[in-house]
Amino acid sequence: MTTKVAANSAAYEAIVRAGPRVKQLQQVHAHLIVTGYGRSRSLLTKLITLACSARAIAYTHLLFLSVPLPDDFLFNSVIKSTSKLRLPLHCVAYYRRMLSSNVSPSNYTFTSVIKSCADLSALRIGKGVHCHAVVSGFGLDTYVQAALVTFYSKCGDMEGARQVFDRMPEKSIVAWNSLVSGFEQNGLADEAIQVFYQMRESGFEPDSATFVSLLSACAQTGAVSLGSWVHQYIISEGLDLNVKLGTALINLYSRCGDVGKAREVFDKMKETNVAAWTAMISAYGTHGYGQQAVELFNKMEDDCGPIPNNVTFVAVLSACAHAGLVEEGRSVYKRMTKSYRLIPGVEHHVCMVDMLGRAGFLDEAYKFIHQLDATGKATAPALWTAMLGACKMHRNYDLGVEIAKRLIALEPDNPGHHVMLSNIYALSGKTDEVSHIRDGMMRNNLRKQVGYSVIEVENKTYMFSMGDESHQETGEIYLYLETLISRCKEIGYAPVSEEVMHQVEEEEKEFALRYHSEKLAVAFDHCEG
């Protein structure tokens, strides 16, 4: 008996030494078979776990099938490993095999499988696992519930996520973070911020994961005061300004217009990655600092920074387009394809057309699109939209009409294309065509999507649309705005109505210009101040 135990121990040590390396594991497996230990459950379980860690799925499954009656420990080992390695299809497959083998799952089983369903965004399958967890007595398990909150959030079912969360007898920081993140990632930034406040009221202290989601929510809503508070909290509490936190802060300050603060955060980051560099480059480009964006990109290349990816090149090319840096943009595009061998996507092509068009190189932009057309890549409406904008900017109305008609043929139900065609006709003096477009839009019930302006006042965000009268202080806002416009007119201000949609009547243009959403937001800020 002593000899057998020693041999078993030696075999186990050999497996551990082999680690997650397939060739060595296969050699150890062969040795086990030769020495008579090839069907040892404990040794096979260790072999299977390591083979799975090496992502040798076929070999893992072969080993698994060699076990006559897999127990719950073996099933949980492969389910946990496949879930951790982001192999969700395999995880769900082993879970189903577990059920068909009449082996009872544990809370760890359900936690891993639910995470895999979240990775797959498999709402129907995940709901089935949820039901099984409840029937099996694990419906109120802390780990299972936290995984369920994440699962429903990733599947876009925030109502389901909230229901699970509200039923939790004990809420963990992980569950709170999952809910905040879920609302933020599903575009419900205000709800994410409210959950954060509820979390604080419940006595939970936020961590780095909380702040990453919260900062993204602040960026979406323009809640710069709350975002600045988060930044100060990070500093005062001595939290590590890791890559995710730093990048989230850069995005926040960029969205709120404070590029200097964004750069300050970037320079203080001890560690950066391609996402952080791209965020900072994008911040410069968005606010018209094209030269600084290009210089930072060059620094990224010259100072052994991270290798730029497709998103980085979109940020640089967009910066060049907005700043009129045509030669720099051409050079960047060439380096992308030649030096980095990246394949440009629609976003890169749109940036190139926009850059050339804004600079007045309409023929070159048009030729660029037709070169893409020859390869079947010019069907994206965004390309023609960028070209149309350039035609309007440089008053090439004939080409603009041709492109607008092409866009309408591609997307007949997009009201924006009809509006652009109407504007082109109006600018060229073809009022009959303007009326024709307007009547057609009314017949087909095509309405341009309403634009909004958001402003933060005393840590609260407010949203305004054109001619908005929903605010409780509407009278005061409009009175202030009228006074301000009167003073502006006294010093020579005159509205340029051609920038407003040309399918509206003159009095409507005046209304649109006078009560633009941005003007209402600024007036409200002054009233409150």
PLM feature spans:
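Terminal (and in a subset, N-terminal) low-complexity or junction segments at the ends
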Residues: 1-172, 181, 190-201, 205-529
